[in-house]
């Protein structure tokens, strides 16, 4: 197969599917292996005839051969590993990653809209303060914790270790928690709302959901509407482990997936175990009235459009802050 057609994540072979700037890692199935082989390779076998001659008979890839291809792909040196798949600029310990796959296993899927960014930290405070001007942060520390969350996905491949989960919380509903986690964080970093997931009721189901998220290549995720008391072994492992171990869907084997996820949760009046609290950075919102849903004094009523318009400037500011640091 052509070089760069197949990759693997934790020895699970797959393809990068989608348009530039929105690629996703999709595990290779037997059916897909057959289609790829037939598209790029002409298979044949020699069949003996009665007159002691042989004739070359061409054939399509069968299921057994597709299984061999899939098995070989997870360890073949031509099939390179992707540890981190990002559609926004990121930094490793060696510096800023250029488009494509770098030697550390970071793949930068550069979208056309982010070409030729010019990092500039000069107006960082003004740019970032204006981005969240409509959100009622309880304190300046909470606001700056959110700015730290914006920076986390950019420097995540650089950090040799774990990063805490950020938790956006409030005592009331409709204060803007989900908008902050999905529309602002996702809109700036990945150009679309942060992927949201509900925590399943059992740790086994949580582990399956987390493993699927990591294999797909998501770099940020939103745990929406967390219940009042947070206590999950699967979630604690996700926050603290450099690799996440789980059972590969549909198979009996266990796999270890590199865990470079930046995680944000939202909830009302959330409490957690002491062990979980050590792994969480709070971002508290405190509305000025008891009816935040009735608020109308927004500087930017169409938040998604505002984020779309300023995304490039905000990313240039964040990259400039990283460079200055």
Regions found by a protein language model. Name each.
Residues 178:
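Walker A/P-loop
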Residues 143-149, 158-166, 183, 187-237, ...:
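Feature primarily recognizes SF3-like P-loop helicase cores of small DNA viruses
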């Amino acid at each position: 197969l052509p070089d760069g057609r197949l990759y693997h994540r934790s020895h699970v072979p797959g393809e990068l599917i989608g348009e530039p700037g929105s690629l996703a890692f999709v595990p290779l199935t037997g059916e897909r292996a057959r289609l790829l082989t037939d598209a790029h390779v002409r298979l044949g076998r020699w069949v003996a005839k009665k007159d002691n001659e042989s004739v070359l008979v061409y054939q399509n890839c069968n299921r057994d051969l597709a299984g061999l291809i899939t098995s070989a792909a997870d360890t073949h040196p031509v099939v390179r590993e992707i540890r981190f798949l990002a559609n926004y600029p990121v930094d490793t310990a060696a510096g800023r990653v250029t488009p494509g796959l770098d030697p550390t296993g970071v793949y930068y899927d550069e979208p056309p809209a982010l070409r030729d960014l010019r990092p500039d930290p000069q107006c960082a405070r003004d740019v970032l303060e204006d981005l969240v001007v409509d959100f009622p942060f309880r304190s300046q520390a909470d606001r700056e914790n959110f700015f730290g969350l914006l920076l986390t996905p950019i420097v995540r491949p650089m950090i040799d270790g774990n990063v805490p989960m950020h938790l956006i919380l409030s005592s009331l509903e409709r204060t803007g928690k989900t908008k902050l986690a999905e529309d602002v964080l996702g809109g700036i970093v990945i150009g679309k709302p942060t992927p949201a997931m509900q925590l399943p009721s059992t740790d086994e189901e949580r582990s399956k959901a987390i493993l699927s998220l990591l294999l797909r290549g998501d770099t940020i995720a939103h745990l929406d509407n967390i219940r009042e008391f947070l206590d999950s072994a699967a979630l604690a492992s996700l926050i603290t482990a450099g690799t996440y171990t789980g059972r590969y869907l549909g198979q009996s084997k266990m796999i270890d997936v590199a865990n470079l996820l930046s995680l944000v949760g939202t909830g009302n009046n959330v409490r957690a175990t002491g062990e979980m609290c050590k792994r969480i950075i709070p971002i508290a919102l405190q509305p000025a009235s008891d009816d935040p849903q009735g608020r109308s004094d927004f500087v930017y009523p169409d938040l998604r459009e505002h984020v779309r318009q300023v995304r490039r400037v905000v990313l240039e500011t964040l990259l400039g802050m990283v460079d200055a640091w």
